């Protein structure tokens, strides 16, 4: 269903299909990633795994449109209600993304993004995943720079108008460490506690950013 919608309705190409083959790792064979509960990222869709009310689900979509990549993901609460902890985790992950985005403009430092995210997440008693990060994006799916979601203010690359990259903090309810499963794709929390993630692809402008993957229902007035 997802692949049909991407190809025939959006007139785009699902970038994940056939992506990422490497020695000891098969290419990804699905059009989206689906990460449930303690899965941090790159979860593989499965017809045998049944979602339950209260599960938190991340859907990650990357498409190629007119030769350029767009990468975005967000959280969904199965059944509309979940635990207080899971609900707060999802809210913090989204706000962390926004706080990282708010630091970006022509002349700002890349390290400011990670600093803003880490400071906020840890103030909420959660942790930021270190092993995976945002990335440059455009005609290439994964490109420089690496966009860390932790770090020090005033460090790293100086950003310039015209750059495009993703900000996609992965926020864990427990420790930040993760584990890669035997399928060589699925990443889970090391302590099996919940994880949540939000992602946007952004364009750096002279005064701030343009959110290239903005959703119609999303309030992005703080970036206008």
Residue ranges, per PLM feature:
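Active-site neighborhoods and metal-handling regions in enzymes and metal-associated proteins
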Residues: 1-224
